[in-house]
Amino acid sequence: MFTQLITALSYRVFLSIFLSMRINTLTNMADPQLTKLIQDLTAIRSFAQRYSKIIRDARDYVIDAGKTGRTKLSEAEKAEKTIFGMKVEAYLRYEFAWGKGPKLDFYFNCIEFDSKATVGKTWMVPPEAVGELCLLTLLDEKRSVYSAGVIRASLTALTKGKNQDKKRSVSAIGKQSIHWLIKDELY
């Protein structure tokens, strides 16, 4: 009985990993623009180290420990957490000399893409970014790590429901299709 349970759990874990890999592979093969963006971003010199500094700087800007006494971003107000995402976007654009796209946050090597950052568990995608490429940043303060990945924000990668701003969140299936450029890196 116990062996069957372990086998069933192992099979589920294997299947989950396999499907995630297949989704990423199929998505990348069918989306040359996504593939090119992944290649271009991973080719940037010291990308992860520079990204880490951006995360620290944006976090420190919002926390403003000397004037607020805070030590964690989780202690900030909701509006201030939004500023974290705005600072990540601005610092990325400056650090990597990316242009501003006509519709989205960035324009780099002939590809336009949006920036989404979260200190929670998911990202909110506005209507103008649906169907577009997004650079996702995830901050995990409890473990002092961050992750950054790229996704095509297709309707299948997003939840059906929308908030009052008509933003959708990345769905469970969408999270499986994220191509992680940086995973659980210390900031």
Each PLM stretch: what is its role?
Residues F2-F108, A117-Y187:
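Nucleic-acid endonuclease domains
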